């Protein structure tokens, strides 16, 4: 790559070349202009790892804990380290741009992508995103803050109009972007799919140009979310630099015509191109060649960081009678549906093929010197477990053959075009290409052999974006080719899982074939969703079992066990892009299993894996409760490190956990109705609502216990004189507090600084988080901790009449909290009311 003289290059570009530069050429690459040494740039998802350019059969990658897990660390230094590793992973994948971090706001526990964002609070989310972005960009890779803005649900996400007051927009939904930009102005921003107050964000000039560029002074590149461009002139004029992905729908001939007819001014077109070329120069020092082959890193130091991140994210919710940590030398019974699966990430564009995974059962087994036994308790799959890993191909390898044809199986003769060997029986073909395939319509035969270990009736399931028929020894068991019903898989583009059953004998080998036709062969109504490329497939199987027998067996075993731990929760099937959850409950049977095991052995520890809150009707019954999130590659080891006390838990909740869904402030207005969703809770999102109405959640924002105890003392505030002649002056307030580890083991404390406003001209939250710091202390050690906040940011609310921030005169209370219920207080004064704009 050669550094460009941007202005000279713009002068030399033809209109056609300028137009081409403002849209992608495929799913992951921008356009090039070889005659002017403008290269193609590669980008990759995403929020919790760098997948590379292929959803289907791609190169494995490091999988970080999900964003809510990283949010629970409250650790900016850790996020900075994770960002640097993400940058290195991006370079290994030949990618110049990472499509992350995600910093939307969890209005509701039900949001399908809630696990992708850090927190319900903008100060926590914005600071963590800023330091992660800083780490990414220190490696020369461009970070992308997304989704700008109010992309907080999946239901009708391409069309829904988010109706939100400008005050809530500023104080809640734009705040994480604003604070992240103060720490690290990212090279890119991705617009949201949705409308805001009547206009799609990708063509919303107020949001893209007036706020992001002019008010905040940001000068990077704005790209659309994938297929999230809805116009030609409107989007260009609003400030959307790059339409993704290619091939373009809106920019090509229509854009050239818009420029020639003055619907888009030439200087506006040049500004869009200028931002593309500036991005080229930003990543030029990387020296990544065009179409660079992808490779894996998976270094020991990376594995250690991922393990530390997984452990630091874990929140100890309850620990009555010091049930935890467990004893390594005592036998342990492991129960539950999440024990022997690795719930390492949520679903959708954040998902990837990890280098490896560690299940909780594997993590516990590696730690324990006592006997480790297992009882299933209940299954919690939403769809039947993948069959592929249990199959063997004709040559005896784990998995099955994947044979591609242009013609259907009914054709009298057909030519084999491509053959692959796969293990996973879930494949999203959006980026599958072959030189002999010149159409989205083609056919695949997937063939392998399955030998069951037990006699019984086996259920088989097929989910497709396309058509699929599953045959066992030539007999059709599942036919998902006609009368298809819409489901939630593959970003909401797939059918529901159609099932069939067959009685099988242990030890007997059966030939399994899935006859698959790509998306154009389907008659499924996909209006309102984007069908990516040729479609996708998933087939699974499971022996039919009695849930009652499984639960009874687990409870009986627990009654006899000295140490018991339950692993339950959600997976990427339940929390995924393209589909919001219908409720907060655990999968069917999980609550009953937990309650009956707790009744049999009250000292059972319960570990929940989920990206967002779940209902816990048994919470009062359990003595030890751990929130373990989706923990990335090292999830099982990170959990075991905490359960056995090798790591002292220090995580704090980044989300409020309500007792029930009805308690959440967005309960009445979360889904789209007639194309709109009203953000009726206004600024009262998460803890702001629960504290305002004095409604206790099950576990509050910021909650988290430790194996040690801490004391906070000697709070002092240092301020500087105000400068009333400067409306935007950000006078610092430094809160200093002594933190002492008063317990028996080393541990980390998160010090939280809150500001409580005086009575002002509008109704305001009881208090708001304005700063935080994390400190590591040995037993008996004490340290002085400083938290610095800007007075204007700590005190301001958005005045809709003036269309400015208002920092009102008055006395403001500072509260400092952490582990435990103790609150230190002090105060400071705003001497003169000020109104301001800016970053």
Swiss-Prot record:
InterPro entries: Cellulose_deg_GH3, Fn3-like, Glyco_hydro_3_AS, Glyco_hydro_3_C, Glyco_hydro_3_C_sf, Glyco_hydro_3_N, Glyco_hydro_3_N_sf, Glycoside_hydrolase_SF. Pathway: Glycan metabolism; cellulose degradation. It comes from the Eukaryota. It is found in: Secreted. SMART domains: Fn3_like, PA14. It catalyses: Hydrolysis of terminal, non-reducing beta-D-glucosyl residues with release of beta-D-glucose. Its EC number is 3.2.1.21. GO terms for molecular function: beta-glucosidase activity. PROSITE patterns: GLYCOSYL_HYDROL_F3, PA14. Gene3D superfamilies: Galactose-binding domain-like, Glycoside hydrolase family 3 C-terminal domain, Glycoside hydrolase, family 3, N-terminal domain, Immunoglobulins. GO terms for cellular component: extracellular region. GO terms for biological process: cellulose catabolic process. It holds the Pfam family Glyco_hydro_3_C. Residues 395-555 form the PA14 domain. The keyword Glycoprotein applies. The active site is at residue 225. Keywords: Carbohydrate metabolism, Cellulose degradation, Glycoprotein, Glycosidase, Hydrolase, Polysaccharide degradation, Secreted. The keyword Hydrolase applies. It is an enzyme of class 3 (hydrolase). Its main location: secreted. Glycans are attached at residue 197. Belongs to the glycosyl hydrolase 3 family. Beta-glucosidases are one of a number of cellulolytic enzymes involved in the degradation of cellulosic biomass. Catalyzes the last step releasing glucose from the inhibitory cellobiose. This is Probable beta-glucosidase I.
